[in-house]
Amino acid sequence: MSARIGAHVDQADPLAEAASRDADLVQFFLGDPQSWKKPSVAYAGGAAALRADAEAAGVDLYVHAPYVINVASTNNRIRIPSRKLLQQTLSLAAEIGAQGVIVHGGHVTADDDPSAGLDNWRKCVEGLDLAVPMLIENTAGGTNAMARRLSTLEQLWDAISAASGFEEVGFCLDTCHAHAAGEELAGLVERVSAITGRIDLVHANDSRDGFGSGADRHTTLGQGQVDLDGLAEVVRSAGAPIVVETPGEGHLDDLAWLRRVLAD
């Protein structure tokens, strides 16, 4: 088994959370994911201590950006604070030595031209100081989402590939979101890689809802409606670190399943 695996955990002591799961990596928020407040480090001793202790423990850190961020938006009151909060998150993630910051692709409204959202993403990448990689994540629903369907993801990648700093932009593939968006997991890694050229992180999640539902409701691996054979194919073929974002009480079972699949 070569892939490093872990889970999304509480931010207060992510290293203790990693140890309790025998995890190689952890993902967490830097503050309230539903707030516009400036991100902060909850770990005792702050950013420097977390970085040093993570390095000593051999645990990789990933930061999930707040859900409120939507840099694709044509609404100035959403887009401008989104860019500011994203930059603050990236900068603090660099201080703790994070491997990357995961951010959702965002959306425009039904009245907007989708190309405006794509161009807003390009401008965002141009304006960011990417001290750590930014990993754009596919999303589950939304007719006007930038990263739900592969056809739109291809347009997004075409738009941002022209931006300076693009080399620090990667992709996070979420299996629950792909399932909810109506994307078959079989062959998905190849289809995504043909667009992005890279997969930097996998969110290995099951779904409480049916294929193409558009619903973003994760559940424990094997207890939902995601095809487990397809999920196994994704984690084996992506060649990327893996995070489970499933209910915490099932993390040990989920990580054990991943270890078995990756060992086969």
Segment roles from a protein language model:
Residues 11, 47, 82, 86, ...:
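Aromatic/hydrophobic pocket-lining residues that form the small-molecule binding cavity
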Residues 1-65, 69, 73-88:
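N-terminal pre-domain/capping segments
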Residues 3-9, 26-28, 61-65, 101-103, ...:
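Hydrophobic faces of well-ordered beta-strands that scaffold small-molecule active sites
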Residues 8-12, 31-33, 66-68, 106-108, ...:
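Active-site beta-loop-alpha junctions enriched in small/polar residues
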Residues 112, 146-150, 154, 177-241:
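Gly/Pro-rich active-site loop or hairpin
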Residues 251-264:
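C-terminal helical cap(s) of enzyme catalytic domains, especially alpha/beta-barrels
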Residues 16-23, 42-62, 88-97, 126-131, ...:
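Acidic (Asp/Glu)-rich catalytic clusters
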Residues 55, 71-170, 180:
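Active-site acidic/histidine proton-transfer and metal-coordination neighborhood
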